[in-house]
């Protein structure tokens, strides 16, 4: 049976504080890694964003136009390459770095206050 003493409570508070400091540093690093995608907001203009004239196409600059002449004969290989290139361009526009994509997934899954407190207690 665990008994909560002054020294054990002090250790627990220190571990929780350490965890929150490390989490803050990780969140800041995630922000720096996603800075490329966030800079798209400044390209669209803060004025447009605040006035409500902001659209998704201004932020990502998707290009869905293509030349139909390359599909003469409806070659399956050409269609496959075309679709693969379009998917890559969309993913690269939305998530400029692989690290940024992984960090966003991890951030949404793990960084909640309840989990931080539980992990701080488990570290003790």
From Swiss-Prot:
One of its GO terms (cellular component) is membrane. It is found in: Membrane. It comes from the Bacteria. It is a single-pass membrane protein. The chain crosses the membrane at residues 13-33. Its main location: membrane. It comes from Bacillus anthracis. This is Uncharacterized protein pXO2-27/BXB0026/GBAA_pXO2_0026. Keywords: Membrane, Plasmid, Transmembrane, Transmembrane helix.
């Amino acid at each position: 049976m665990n008994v909560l003493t002054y020294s054990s409570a002090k250790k627990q508070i220190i571990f929780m504080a350490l965890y929150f400091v490390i989490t803050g540093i990780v969140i800041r690093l995630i922000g720096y890694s996603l800075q490329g995608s966030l800079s798209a907001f400044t390209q669209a203009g803060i004025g447009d964003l605040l006035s409500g004239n902001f659209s998704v196409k201004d932020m990502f600059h998707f290009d869905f136009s293509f030349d139909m002449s390359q599909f003469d004969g409806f070659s399956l290989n050409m269609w496959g390459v075309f679709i693969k290139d379009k998917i890559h361009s969309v993913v690269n526009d939305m998530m400029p770095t692989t690290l940024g994509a992984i960090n966003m997934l991890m951030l949404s899954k793990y960084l909640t206050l309840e989990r931080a407190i539980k992990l701080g207690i488990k570290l003790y």
